Design a protein with these regions (language model features):
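N-terminal amphipathic, basic helical "cap/leader" segment at the start of enzyme domains
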Residues: 1-97, 196-198
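C-terminal helix-cap and adjacent tail motif
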Residues: 2-9, 15-16, 166-198
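Helix-biased detector of long, well-ordered alpha-helical tracts
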Residues: 100, 108-112, 191-198
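Short, electropositive alpha-helical surface patch
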Residues: 154-167
Length: 198
């Protein structure tokens, strides 16, 4: 590889990982289609045992978010048929919290060498890659799961099959507020060299 001896191509990426955070409040604009297409393609470069490609993703933006909101309302009414208008409207608005939503779906294949948890992790890696790339381009995202990820009305409305599972809703847009201070994390709380010395 021919590069300047002073160059450190990994530095910026490591800095981005260290600065990444979730942005629960997002607004327009979302990244344009050209940028999104590049991000989506690159995000697929993850560990994928036996090349099962155990994932698919739904991109929901614009007025289509209202249809997702309708599914959230169906879930609300299924749990409480007497839910009032205010409760239903609150559920509906949750689909409008960002200009773009990527629904990450694990598509499980029965394979003797690749358990479902490994396939789920691979799908999660793609979602995480998308979030990192979004942040590196000056936008923000937040990964949500919650009851809608396992809701029958939502899963059926989004066309999930019996071998599929929603792993997250990645909300994407422009952060509405400036960066919040990053909470300190101590590496040594989670990483230990083995064997441990007594």
């Amino acid at each position: 590889m021919d590069m300047d001896s002073n160059a450190n191509p990994g530095k910026n990426f490591i800095e981005i990982m260290g600065q990444r955070r979730s942005f629960p409040r997002l607004e327009e604009p979302a990244p344009d289609k050209e940028l999104l297409d590049n991000i989506f393609l690159s995000s697929l470069r993850v560990p994928d045992h036996m090349h099962l490609r155990p994932w698919r993703f739904l991109i929901i933006g614009g007025d289509d978010r209202n249809y997702l909101g309708d599914l959230f309302v169906k879930d609300c009414l299924q749990k409480d048929p007497n839910a009032g208008e205010e409760t239903c409207e609150s559920a509906r608005k949750k689909a409008l919290r960002a200009p773009l939503i990527v629904v990450g779906i694990a598509h499980y294949t029965d394979h003797p060498k690749v358990p479902e948890i490994e396939q789920a992790l691979a799908t999660g890696c793609v979602l995480n890659n998308i979030g990192l790339a979004i942040y590196s381009c000056g936008y923000g995202s937040v990964w949500r799961t919650g009851p809608y990820a396992v809701s029958s009305p939502v899963c059926e409305g989004l066309g999930l099959n019996s071998n599929e599972e929603i792993l997250g809703f990645l909300y994407i847009g422009t952060p509405m507020k400036a960066d919040r201070p990053i909470k300190a994390i101590k590496k040594d709380d989670f990483f230990k060299y083995w064997p441990a010395k007594v």
